[in-house]
Amino acid sequence: MRSSSSPFFLSFNSGPGMVLKAFFPTCCASADSGLLVGRWVPEQSSAVVLAVVHFPFIPVQVKELLAQVQQASQVGVAVLGTWCHRRQEPEESLGHFLEGLGTLFSHEPWLQLCRERGSKSWNCKATRRQGPTPLAPACEDQVMLIFYDQRKVLLSRLHPPAALPERQAGDATASAGGLAAVFDTVARSEVLFQSDRFDEGPVRLTHWQSEGVEASILVELAKRAAGPVCLLLACLLSLVSAASACRVFRPWPLSFIWSKLSTCEQLRHRLDQLTLVVSAHRAEGPAQLMRKANTLVSVLLDMALGLLLLSWLHRKDRFAHLAEALVPVADRVAEELQHLLQWLMGAPAGLKMNRALDQVLGRFFLYHIHLWISYIHLMSPFIEHILWHLGLSACLGLTVALSILSDIISLLTFHIYCFYVYGARLYSLKIHGLSSLWRLFRGKKWNVLRQRVDSCSYDLDQLFIGTLLFTILIFLLPTTALYYLVFTLLRLLVVTVQGLVHLLVDLINSLPLYSLGLRLCRPYRLAAGVKFRVLEHEAGRPLRLLMQINPLPFSHVVRTYRLPSCGCHPKHSWGSLCRKLFFGELIYPWRQRGDKQD
Amino acid sequence: MEDERSLSDICGGRLALHRRYYSPSCLEFCLSCPRISLRSITAVTCTVWLAAYGLFTLCENSMILSAAIFITLLGLLGYLHFVKIDHETLLIIDSLGIQMTSSYASGKESTTFIEMGKVKDVIINEAIYMQKVIYYLCILLKDPVEPHGISQVVPIFQSAKPRLDCLIEVYRSCQEILAHQKAASTSP
């Protein structure tokens, strides 16, 4: 229906006023005379030239080739006009011959490009018949020449990707906006570029690959080897995931521990990613391919960094030093905590505490620390072996090593976490009690049914006991609040350190290194758009422009191709965090995805 | 054919408007901003180094001086590459689109191209900027969903900030080409 070879078809948008744009590949600018082959886009009044067919040719064979290409690529390839690259003296016979071709391959409008050899002056003419009969007078359109680098346009990908139409029979609807249609045409016509000048085909073409099809031995070998390697890796990974899902790890204490450790989370994430990469399905589209490549490069870099870390640790027997330093450090931390508690039990910062409560709380926490120190001393002979075995896991990747570090920090500061929970629970109990008794003091009550504060008439003895309790609680508030404040600050410190480690792990997990490398080395592959440059212009000659690819900025590359990660983001805003701190609710600022609310 | 005029921007600095007419359907306007002056570079460098020397006499640490030199160099390079715009160009090609290029002092160029199918109109708009009312030229983009709506307003010559006389000239030329484009696109 939209076949461009019908002489009765007139484009509705391109009247005589609209300038005709001819997209011409730079590789064909020095080719010999011949026919122009490409696609005509009537909505934008543009002709995308894909190749030049040289003399001598047999018209029937040219038509056959074009039909084959049209079948294979779903692009409406047709003969658009003639190309003449001649010497200084115009050859009259050639001129008539070229015009005669117009009747053979009828196309509206018929393009005639002409260039003098060795000079930069071009001549363009586009003729269009104004009636159904061949004898009707022809009218000429203004032509604008736009040069484009065929190889770069073929390989590049526009962002944001225009909604590419599905492959339909016949000419694809150019619902893609103006320039996206050009990119789309060149990308789909790859089958036209398969033959080079060393082939013995019936038709001689010039296009970007006509000097010889490019290929790399390494890439071809890698492609051949990739199949069996992927199969082997996929089997191994399925074995590992089956082993991890087996019954041994199901019972409750173990599954609870696995869910809390960030190392397991990271290992699971890596396993998922690797399974995706080595799966046997082909990537559906360019986005999937980029994601696979990014994942692979990220995993390889991770392992390389991990091995580097391992070799550095082994070099000067650093494991032994670390193990030796670990127990004194834990001891030191416990000692500092004891000093802190002694300070709180006295008169901290000149404040006067309630002596009895102070002593109770202080002794309680001191006993905990005593237990903790004994536990650490119990473990100290085994520390070096444990550390050595954990260090081996660094060969699985730097992210795993960092996750193990974060887990070790959690385990070593477990007593701070316990103290924080005790302090917070005590404080929140006190605050709730205080608020309820304060309402009683004013003669009001919380209505659970209506979720609001209502007035209530209390008995005298209720009021008496309530006021007494209120007074007791309010006088004990500073002591509890101080303990709560101190332990919350310690807990926040530990959480900040862990958060930084997790941030680093997240960064390594989600950075799209392959895309960034591509943007650095082959910027034309990721295109944000195009840019034009006006070439030397002489009066009376057609306007010549050079179309270049405008590469995507680095920030957009990261944003578009960012890999999905474990999602370690702070779940609360600052306002809700402050509110929770004030009321003594427990906070878990860094939540992994899939954690249940406590 | 080419045309060059000397104008001023909203703060009184000198601008040069360079107009190139390639063909009835292709026009280019180039606005050159005032160059970076040696006086301001010298003033900033002297201030930073004096402050560093003052710190050095307090702390007796020679790292401060090397750090000051490093910071000055990096700051200058960063300023030339990311902040200081040398000239801004507007290229209008009938039936193709509008292209805006900013060239930085270090030679970096950042280009944006808007296809003609997305351009609704080019207008001069007023804005209140601190205590002044300024005029700026902007491109209105069509909304793909609503035929009479505007999806985005793209200002042109944002760092050169020329005055109304320059804007009127650019506006007239743009409107000529856009009118031609509209006539061509609506004719049967």
Swiss-Prot record, chain B:
Q: What is this protein called?
A: Phosphatidylinositol N-acetylglucosaminyltransferase subunit H
Q: What is the lineage of its organism?
A: Eukaryota, Metazoa, Chordata, Craniata, Vertebrata
- One of the protein's GO biological processes: GPI anchor biosynthetic process
Q: Which UniProt keywords apply?
A: Cytoplasm
InterPro entries with a match to the protein in the record: GPI-GlcNAc_Trfase_PIG-H_dom, PIG-H
**GO cellular component terms listed in the entry, alphabetical order:** glycosylphosphatidylinositol-N-acetylglucosaminyltransferase (GPI-GnT) complex
Q: Does the keyword ATP-binding apply?
A: no
What is its biological role? Answer: Part of the glycosylphosphatidylinositol-N-acetylglucosaminyltransferase (GPI-GnT) complex that catalyzes the transfer of N-acetylglucosamine from UDP-N-acetylglucosamine to phosphatidylinositol and participates in the first step of GPI biosynthesis.
Instruction: Decide whether keyword Chaperone is in the record.
Output: no
